[in-house]
Amino acid sequence: MAKWNWLKGLRCVAGVGATLMASSMAVAGDVNPIDNVANPEHVFTQTSYNLAGDVCGSCGDAGCRTDGCSGCDDGCDMFGLRCDQDEINIFDGVEVGGHAQFGYTSEVTLFNATGQEEEFQLNQGWIYLEKVAESECGEWALGYRGDFVYGVDGPNTNSFGNAVNATTGFGAFDLEEGFVRGAGYAWAIPQLYVEATNGDTTVKAGHFYTLHGYEVVPATGNFFFTHAYSMNNSEPFTHTGVVVTQKVSDDMEVYAGWTAGWDTGFVQRNDSSSFLGGFSTAVSDDVSFTYITSFGNFGAIGDGYAHSAVLDWQINDKLNYVFHHDLLRADAADNDVVAINQYLIYQLSDCVGVGGRAEWWKNDGTSVYALTGGLNIKPHSQITIRPEVKYDWSPGGQVAADGNNGFDNGTIDGSNETTFSVDVIFTF
């Protein structure tokens, strides 16, 4: 039985009152047929039609009264349907949207980029379908979501934690034949899940983004075009499993769940099985803190433990500071991989933001540092341009597994690299 919350009770009573008032207004003929839609840039605007074949306002030709659809004569009744019935919306409650990200980068390192250098390419052609689970008065509600991606980010977004057949080079789910298209391009399905909620408790099951870290998979969720070393090398991107989110109070959420390791798609690899959980809390009106941990059999990298901690401080209306820490200990690495990232973002105006990112990433006893500076320019509400410059260096020389250096395939000692990148994102 759902716990009764007196505040929710008041909302329910208020909702009933609002419904009765709306009903009385409808009798008086004062009805607005168009609902306001939140976040309209991600929702298709649709025109609804009655099944007589005409828009309601012009249904006089179908035998309806010419003063609109407040009533019909005998000529309007077709197949048991009438023009004054409720409109049918096949996308009722479903949000459809996405984005297209095109980018250029002067250098591609062994650790921190996808695609080809010095080429303008499609990084993410992204579309999603989502029905948000919206609970009313503590009742359980169902929802679902699917995300589908094509581009040079595809190979870094699919279920690359799945086992691959040594002969064919293909695996399960979005590693099957047909998903890889050549020239660095591939399809991916980073999310495909169902969820249920009663307002305080949300259960998500399927394939979904990780809770780890600060930067995210979709380009629209990050200030910078390039990613931090920690995201690409110390964190999972996705999981398959079940995770529960419990709202403890208005200021705190707790997460707990089971996953089939890291970056797997609806299969286990080497009996992968791990815990994923943590919490997020508002320390004050301006500061939030999130701690996420996972441990167990991660699959491709064996048994391990990882955690990430993110402190987000909204200093004022324009200035935001973020501190992010990662720790990974896994059998495959045989050592601790640690990272600290710091972000400082200043909003010059509603259309222009400037930001900086400082990184320290340490793996196998060798440290890598990076400084990134960039802009977010919005000439239109659905267009974002992100130019940036990034400087990477490793005093001791960062060596990849194949013996090459991580920067421009250069020399081992005293490595450094400067990268210029820019992308443009169109949202719909």
Language model region names:
Residues 251-253, 270-365, 369-370:
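Detector for outer-membrane/organellar transmembrane beta-barrel domains
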Residues 104-110, 135, 152-158, 211-215, ...:
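Gram-negative outer-membrane beta-barrel proteins
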Residues 1-16:
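Bacterial Sec-dependent N-terminal signal peptides
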Residues 92, 116-125, 185-190, 236-240, ...:
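Residues that define the transmembrane beta-barrel architecture of outer-membrane proteins
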Residues 101-105, 147-151, 208-210, 257-261, ...:
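Outer-membrane beta-barrel pore domains and translocons
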Residues 94, 135-138, 200-203, 251-256, ...:
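Repeated loop/turn-to-beta-strand initiation elements of outer-membrane beta-barrel proteins
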Residues 107-117, 155-193, 197-280, 290-295:
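Surface-exposed coil loops of outer-membrane beta-barrel proteins
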Residues 29-203, 244-246, 312, 345, ...:
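Beta-barrel outer-membrane channel/assembly domains of diderm bacteria
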